[in-house]
Amino acid sequence: MQAKATDSRQEPTLNMDTNARRNFIKFHAKLGEKPATTVRFFDHTDRYTVHGSDDCELVAKIVYKSTAFIGALLPDDKKETLQFVSMSKGNFELAVRELLLVRNYRVEVYVKNSSDWEIEYRGSPGNLLQFEDILFSNKEVLVGNSIISLLVKLDGGGQRRVGVASVEQNDCKFQLLEFLDDDFFTELEATVVLLGPKECLLPSIEGEYSAVKTLLDRNGVMITMPKKSGDNDLLQDLNRLLRFAKGQQEDATGLKELQLQLASNALKTAIKYLDLVNDAGNLGHYEIKQLDLNRFVHLDSAAVAALNIMPKPGTHPSMPSYRWQSVLGVLDHCRTPQGHRLMGQWVKQPLRSRNILNDRHNIVQCLLESPDTMETLSLDYLKRIPDILMLTKKLMRRKANLQDLFRIYQVILRTPKILKVLHELDNSTIESVICAPFKSFLKDLTGLKQMVEQVVDFEAIERGEYLVKASFDSRLMELQQMMTELYSKMEELQFKCSQELNLDGKNQVKLESVAKLGHHFRITVKDDSVLRKNKNYRIVDVIKGGVRFTSDKLEGYADEFASCRTRYEEQQLSIVEEIIHVAVGYAAPLTLLNNELAQLDCLVSFAIAARSAPTPYVRPKMLEEGARELVLEDVRHPCLELQEHVNFIANSVDFKKEECNMFIITGPNMGGKSTYIRSVGTAVLMAHIGAFVPCSLATISMVDSILGRVGASDNIIKGLSTFMVEMIETSGIIRTATDKSLVIIDELGRGTSTYEGCGIAWSIAEHLAKETKCFTLFATHFHEITKLAETLSTVKNCHMAAVADADDFTLLYQVRSGVMEKSFGIQVARLANFPEHVVQNAQEVYNEFEDEHVDKQKKEDKALLEKIQVAIQQLSTAGNNVDINVEDLTQLVTQFTKDIEQLDSDYFKSVLATSEA
């Protein structure tokens, strides 16, 4: 079946003679080794190739889903041959898009010059400039394109200072920050999660940077070590790149952001690597600001994975799985590309500002109370908004045309209609947060709107043509007159043709024009027989919509018309260039308008997500950080409840300062422990984004971090065992968590021996409950840890309920108070359809171990009784001896205690624990 699929789109073979192939093999060998994450393409004008076994296999699987298309340049010479895969331009673009945007590979394209091959284009996940036309032509840009550069410096006192510079090329934005960090780079990881870079520039991967490399690998960020070059002048570069306010001196010297010297040096490296200064489209359009991490809730990579915040790489919003695979998919009902991008930022950047969150919640509530308005905004207005940011970038790079300018004009026309709909809601928050900025931006864009109306020929647009008004130039007037006359003649031929073929009314002959055919006639397929009888006309082609045909006269007029049209477009080029030059001056208000429309799209999306859920979401009541309260009634997991054939059983959580700050959750495997703690974490995250939450009631105090340790899988590729991953992630939690944090931990300590694992889990749970006092959901199989509730009043035990008898085992997925008294491992194995003989064997082994334990306890109990009898006799004798002193008596009791301790008796331990309590 696969062979048939690939044969249907067979690629051209590599048309090179034997001598040319041998020369190419020699050239390819001279290129030497390349990084495994770099793929080299070779442009043969009419096709592209990749070479080498690794690149061929990778690209063949991307393009053809098969390695059957891998060939050999010299199939008869196995010693000197070189593998290759050949592909069309369309498949080359498909491969480049997959490599750069999904798989985080670098791409190089070589072009043949007169005598040799030279590299023409380079691209990486964080530097897509040279591939933008390939990647985003007729494609929505749904993800950000950011790159970071960082430097690490050890201060005199041994403190580790990190300087980070982020460059967002889509938004033309520089962000700088510096901070002190620990040996594990905890703050740096939070920064990487927050910014979501595709690529990171490092000066080295050794020494201090070795741990940084490990962190970046863990977060799926490509690492690049740029070549050291001559010192570029940062101030000079910024003076050219930055957009200064009107009246502001164009001098970056006094910018407060540049006081961050380490981050500034990192920025200098990024500007040089991206070659920003040599692209005229960047000049005068960038903004620079200092990033404040304290504005955002701290997220580590473990929490991002545990809460399923982001979908799997390559998952497009149009895919069915996108909706339930991640929190982003659940919330993302955006209609615009800029809305999709902003939503991706928001879910990774939960806020700590209660005021901003209340504004977002107010707007979402208002939209939910006006469902007709919500649908109008989503389906009628936002759906028709193009990607203004990408259109603005085309303007800045002087690659825009009149059609692009007209699309921007349409947005300027539609925005007042959106404003009118929003005004009708009569909501003060919407007026201040959305409407007021819209009015300001529209005022700034008045000049652009007027220019388009004066210059663009709107009548031509109705015919699908984008032309400058002829009144702007005498030669244009002349050419337009010629085209008008030619069109009139073609209409006369159309009328004459209808009469000749005896077609009128609905069946009349239509005059049409398409790019490949020019002007032609068209009739319905059922009238085909009438046409074939007339020798004055000849059929061009037959399509589903009808029969296209022409005549000698029509063809002559059509050719003349096309010639006039070409000359018209050539004549208007200089005028269009001047219009685009003027339009570039409106880049700033266009960018702001784009951002405001993206924000509206996200808020409407929140409302749609809240209403369309199986059970509608509710507005969370947000309290200040110090309130320390988390009450969620009937909380559900937003992803799980969207899946088919799932009837979600909701549960609740109730944390209050000084009353309860930790749930220790026990219960059988598959009983719902992980889902429960993730549901709580996800609800808190959604509230801090500004969305409503999947509960029946929610009261949430602001948190400063959401930290997680969920799941246990060996990270073999990075050389880390289950236990090492556990320890790395958990140590990060201990270092970062405060009394304002939410921590979710699942099955900690299972990667090592039972006793060590239990000891570590106990110690961490006790530290979080007693010292940190953060809100913690601690799911565990170590029932011993439930004893913490006996010594710490703020720790509560709960379990996932299950019912079992001799034949049946039912998981109830309900959280109930108290400890799960019984283990159900064997029942779960049977539920998972283990072979019955395996289950029976497990039961026998279990019974054997339990019998041994009982026998051991019986022996220990007998020995204990003997010791007690001896002790009683000795104490009785001592008590009757009036000459015995206190020291001798104390020594006797102490020895008795030691003897019993050596017996390792459970009974004695419980008595001792009770007496100590």
Swiss-Prot record:
One of its GO terms (cellular component) is nucleus. Gene3D superfamilies: 1.10.1420.10, DNA repair protein MutS, domain I (3.40.1170.10), MutS, connector domain (3.30.420.110), P-loop containing nucleotide triphosphate hydrolases (3.40.50.300). Keywords: ATP-binding, DNA damage, DNA repair, DNA-binding, Nucleotide-binding, Nucleus. It is found in: Nucleus. It comes from the Eukaryota. GO terms for biological process: interstrand cross-link repair; maintenance of DNA repeat elements; mismatch repair; mitotic recombination; postreplication repair. ATP binds at G667, P668, N669, M670, G671, G672, K673, S674. One of its GO terms (molecular function) is DNA binding. Involved in postreplication mismatch repair. Binds specifically to DNA containing mismatched nucleotides thus providing a target for the excision repair processes characteristic of postreplication mismatch repair. Belongs to the DNA mismatch repair MutS family. Heterodimer of Msh2/Spel and Msh6. This is DNA mismatch repair protein spellchecker 1. The lineage of its organism: Eukaryota, Metazoa, Ecdysozoa, Arthropoda, Hexapoda.
